[in-house]
Amino acid sequence: MLKNDLFLRALKRQPCSRTPIWVMRQAGRYLPEYRAIREKTDFLTLCKTPELAAEVTIQPVELMGVDAAIIFSDILVVNEAMGMDVEIIETKGIKLSPPIRSQVDIDRLSVPDVHDKLGYVLDAIRLTKKELDNRVPLIGFSGAAWTLFTYAVEGGGSKNYAFAKKMMFRDPKMAHMLLSKISSVISDYVCAQVEAGADAIQIFDSWASALSEDDYREFALPYIKENVQALKTKYPDIPVIVFSKDCNTILEDIAATGCDAVGLGWGIDIAKARTILGDRVCLQGNMDPTVLYGTPEKIKAEAGKILKQFGQHTANSGHVFNLGHGILPDVDPANLKLLVEFVKEESAKYH
């Protein structure tokens, strides 16, 4: 039994004594303890060494007191498992080769056995679960098909997604073929993470805001829905969070994927999101990550405002406090610790 199951209770919209908190990228460069490990190894080796991945996954639980751990990995491990060469240089960016821009390229990508090609992530989950010893839940995750598609077609990050959109608009059938292939791997991967011990899954659609509402409905949401349904068919009790970055205008469509929680960017007042969605899903978010550069007073004021905007909890409401995107690498860890402690203390009165 979990000693602290607040995060899972909130996702399932069950009564909680306070609002749980974790933050995206909580295992990362802002922590000196993480940097000490990273100095000895490169990023992908860290992802692929279960003992090290488990160690950095647990660091924020022990150092910051967050209510959930998220497995240390990267969304691009899926692209690599499908046969792409992935280079991640933390300060310089990402390169994937060869870029996928033709039918021949798509055919060349494999649909791997995730237990084989992504076994190191599953091993890291098993080891982390053991070392967490039921202190807090463990989140598994994957990138969404649209985001992994853009990386595959662009061959890296992009400002305007020209190659990805060219394929979408010139040959939508080919685009859907690639999206579908990626999506099938994601479905297998998230199910395998749950088999290995993940207590919840988050799907990250980091480049969601690159698409118009209609294009998002056509090229992104159907695949997220496919992934959620694949997981729910096998593991109906495992909660799923969908984080479609900055898609604040189509929250109802995101909720309609069947997810348990919708991750919010900081561009929307959480009260407005709750009005739109009612309490049919849990809401996760949504403080601007740069607030953590502020004074202790400012951090508390902003966090307090979000808790107040969400308002009083009902018998079937859910809120997981988080940032609207990942914590930035040059944030003072003391500021995150202050945020975590403040949310734990301040949120109780709303429950």
Swiss-Prot record:
Catalytic activity: uroporphyrinogen III + 4 H(+) = coproporphyrinogen III + 4 CO2
GO molecular function per UniProt: uroporphyrinogen decarboxylase activity
Record keywords, A-Z: Cytoplasm, Decarboxylase, Lyase, Porphyrin biosynthesis
GO cellular component terms attached to this protein's record: cytosol
Domain of life of the organism encoding this protein: Bacteria
Subunit structure, as described in the record: Homodimer.
Record protein name field: Uroporphyrinogen decarboxylase
Organism of this sequence: Chlorobium phaeovibrioides (strain DSM 265 / 1930)
